[in-house]
Structure formats: C-alpha cells, structure tokens
UniProtKB/Swiss-Prot annotation:
Name of a matching Pfam family: LysR_substrate
Annotation: DNA-binding region: 22-41
Span of domain HTH lysR-type: 5-62
The organism of origin for this protein: Xanthobacter flavus
CDD domains tied to this protein: PBP2_CbbR_RubisCO_like (cd08419)
Entry-linked InterPro entries: LysR_subst-bd, Tscrpt_reg_HTH_LysR, WH-like_DNA-bd_sf, WH_DNA-bd_sf
UniProt gene name: cbbR
UniProt GO molecular function: DNA-binding transcription factor activity; transcription cis-regulatory region binding
Keywords: Activator, DNA-binding, Transcription, Transcription regulation
Source organism phylogeny: Bacteria, Pseudomonadati, Pseudomonadota, Alphaproteobacteria, Hyphomicrobiales
Protein name, entry field: HTH-type transcriptional regulator CbbR
Function of the molecule: Transcriptional activator for the cbb operon (cbbLSXFP) for RuBisCO and other Calvin cycle genes. Binds specifically to two binding sites in the cbbR-cbbL intergenic region.
Keyword DNA-binding assigned: yes
Length: 333
C-alpha cells in the first residue's frame, strides 16, 4: 500500500530536524504547535516507527527520520528543477544559472561571468565560491548548474568543457637568497625553506603534495597553513616563506615586482580550467549558453603572466620562446 505522506509533512520533518523543536517548525510554517504535533503523529503512525528522539531537550532524527529527510531533500530539489524548467519553457530566452567556482578561479571567473551577463542580461547568475571539496559536493548534490574548476574526480560522472591552461609555480620574496643561486633549484631544495600552503581539500594543496612526492620529497615541512590565496601572497611578500601557487593568482604582483617566480625543476605544472556539470543535472538553455560561452571565450579572461625574468618559464612558447611547461594529467583544482 502506498504511503499517505504529504509534502507538508515532509517539510515539517525537515524544519523540526533543523530546529530541534516542533514548536519552531510550527512557527516557520505558520501553523499552531498542536497542528504540527498531530501531523507528525499521523506520519509516525503511517510509517510505523518513530522519526525523532529527544536528546538533551532537542529533537534528533532517528534512522527512519534520516531516510525521510533524504527523501524530502530529493523531492525539494526535483520540484525546484521542475519550476525552473517550466519557467524556461514559458520564456526560453530567460533563466537562471547557479555557478560554483573554486576559490582560485575568482581571479578570472567574475570577469568572464560579467561579460556573459552583458551579452545575456536576461539570464540571472548566482555565484558560489568554495574550495575544491566544496565545489565537488555541490556538483554531486546537483546544487550547481555549472562549475568552474579543474578536472573532476574520475568517479564523478560529468560533462567537461575546456576553458584554458592553468600553470602553477613557486613564488618568493623578491630578495630571497635562492635567486642568487647558480645551481638549478629542485623541489627537494624547497623542503629546507618555509612553505606557506593552502588548507587540506584545496586543489592547490593536493597538486603541491603530488609535485613533491613525484620529485622524491614527500611530506614537505609546512611552516604555515593558510586558507586564502590573498593572505598567502601577502605573507610571501612579508618574507614569511615561499608558496606553491596558481600563476593566475599572482600575475599582478609579479608584473609589479612585488613577487618573483623561482625557476624550479619540473615547474610550472600545467593543469586545465574546465566548465563542469554533473551528467545527472538537467541543463536548461541558460546553463547551456554559459557552458558554450566559457568554452568559446573563457580563455580570454585568464590573467596573463609577464615575460622576462621568471615569466619566461610559463608563458606560451610563441610568446616566451621557452621550453614547454610540464603537463600533469588528471590534475585537481
């Protein structure tokens, strides 16, 4: 026999779980507490097991309650998708796109999105910034229509469109003693320096650890863990250490002479910027238009590194005359 659950009951379950109180759930829904209690009692009678237990005076979902919560989230997401799809059918030229962007991409993604909005002002964009783990979670949960990041994990079934290359380098204070060294610098040499690194879960951190491991210097000593590229740059300029970092995040500082690029063996490591969407995510015309735009024109918004000292190692060959940069397959962002 099919259950007699209602959308209102499932919504009340979600509100009660979030607030830990039927009274607060009633307030949020504009109902009286007795009405909510009656709804929850009817739902528990229908499923035959308790949905909540009281712990320290708060409601906590049981295993059955967690199952209902998961179902409610899926249903709410499906209804939201249906609402957006219907709106797109009524006005195909309009729409909205939720865009997840890894934090390192904020040095070009806003400019690209602004250009897209100028061309398609009728499309609403919502921008969400996070580290690699945050963005992957948003793709898996189907919260994002499009994500701007590096290559997604192989287990994640996704469509990807290439935006452009993404080089990684090591930067240092302009007066660092290593710039006077005649011998070529290796990653192993850097283990004797103070390294400023991103937090675990950051694609830059993952890639840095891979570079050191492949160079035979795993687990490099970390002087400071910093969750912001901006703070890392300021810390390097202040003389606190060296940083393995995206070249796109330091283009302005290198051009202005506030940071210098160390010539390190095996660097730069080049990965790719991609526009990504989950294959399970229904992409409406507005999202498809953004994917097409990023593939076609996204590379033009990538920061350009200066030539000359340091810059020659990661400018394109036709600009710098340098040897090709090292490319790493399946690089994280």
């Amino acid at each position: 026999m099919a259950p007699h659950w209602t959308l209102r009951q499932l919504r009340l379950v979600a509100l009660a779980a979030a607030s830990g109180s039927y009274a607060k759930a009633a307030q949020d829904m504009g109902l009286s507490p007795p009405a909510v209690t009656a709804q929850m009692k009817a739902l528990e009678e229908d499923i035959g097991v308790p949905m909540f237990e009281r712990v320290d005076g708060r409601l906590r979902p049981t295993a059955a309650g967690q199952e209902l919560l998961s179902a409610q989230e899926r249903i709410a997401r499906a209804l939201s998708e249906a609402e957006r799809a219907i709106a797109a059918l009524k006005s195909p030229e309009r729409g909205s796109v939720v865009v997840g962007v890894v934090s390192t991409a904020k040095y070009f993604a806003p400019m690209a999105l602004a250009a897209f909005r100028r061309r398609r002002p009728e499309i609403e964009l919502r921008l969400i910034i996070g580290n690699r783990e945050d963005i992957i979670r948003g793709i898996v949960s189907l919260d994002f229509d499009v994500a701007i990041m590096g290559r997604p994990p192989p287990a994640l079934e996704a469509e990807t469109r290439l935006i452009g290359d993404h080089p990684h380098i090591v930067v240092a204070p302009v007066d660092h003693p290593l710039f006077k060294r005649r011998k070529r610098i290796t990653p192993a040499d850097l283990t004797r320096e103070s390294l400023l690194v991103r937090e675990p879960g950051s694609g830059t951190r993952i890639l840095m650890e891979r570079v050191f491991e492949e160079a035979g210097a795993p687990n490099p000593p970390i002087a400071m863990e910093i969750g912001s590229n901006e703070t890392i740059k300021q810390s390097v300029m202040a003389g606190l250490g060296l940083a393995f970092i995206s070249a796109h995040t330091v283009a302005a500082e290198v051009a202005d002479g506030r940071l210098r690029v160390l010539e390190v063996e095996g660097l730069p490591v080049v990965r790719q910027w991609l526009a990504v969407r989950a294959r399970d995510k229904r992409l409406l015309p507005a999202g498809q238009a953004l994917m097409d735009f990023l593939e076609r024109e996204g590379a033009s918004f990538l920061p350009q590194m200066p030539g000359g000292e340091g810059g020659r190692c990661y400018l394109p060959d036709h600009v710098s005359g340098s040897t090709p940069a090292k490319a790493v397959a399946r690089d994280p962002v």
